[in-house]
């Protein structure tokens, strides 16, 4: 069974570049080696940030590829856990991971480290390098 993953925006930005050492993570998604769990809030952030770091066309194409992929699962978290207090915007990823029963969130953001200290609900966070190692298994 495929692992279910929530990708923080900073990691999505790193894996989509054709010249990135993390590009295999994007290709693994396209090949169905993991399921990407997203919400409308997450897709909106992906679009906003991709438009800023690349352009509107790239943002549109990447978000469309995610939406249309059979390896994407959409979730609509109705309950907001508020587990990350330092950056409330990060909670959209946590809420999606909980509702999706995701195996983990992939993030390089230090704010997510607080989740290691919260016993319930348990949310695992992996760095991009750890995720890459998982994909090689």
Question: Which role does the model predict for each range below?
Answer:
Residues 28, 96, 117:
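Hydrophobic/aromatic ligand-binding patch that stacks against planar heteroaromatic rings
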Residues 7, 17-51:
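PIN/NYN-family metal-dependent endoribonuclease catalytic core
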Residues 71-105, 110, 114:
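Active-site neighborhoods of divalent-metal-dependent phosphate/nucleic-acid chemistry enzymes
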Residues 11-12, 42, 111-112:
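Alpha-helix capping/helix-boundary segments
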Residues 59-67:
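Short, well-structured alpha-helical segments
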Residues 110-137:
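Acidic, PIN/NYN-like endoribonuclease modules and their adjacent C-terminal/linker elements
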Residues 2-4:
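Extreme N-terminal starter segment of soluble prokaryotic enzymes
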């Amino acid at each position: 069974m495929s692992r279910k993953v929530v990708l923080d925006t900073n990691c999505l930005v790193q894996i989509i570049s054709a010249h990135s050492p993390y590009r295999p993570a994007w290709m693994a998604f396209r090949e169905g080696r993991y399921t990407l769990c997203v919400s409308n809030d997450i897709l909106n952030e992906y679009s906003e940030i991709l438009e800023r770091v690349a352009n509107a066309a790239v943002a549109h194409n990447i978000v469309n590829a995610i939406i249309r992929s059979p390896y994407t699962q959409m979730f609509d978290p109705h309950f907001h856990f508020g587990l990350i207090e330092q950056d409330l915007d990060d909670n959209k990823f946590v809420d999606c991971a909980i509702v999706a029963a995701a195996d983990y969130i992939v993030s390089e953001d230090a704010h997510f480290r607080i989740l290691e200290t919260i016993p319930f609900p348990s949310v695992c966070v992996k760095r991009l390098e750890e995720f890459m190692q998982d994909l090689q298994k």
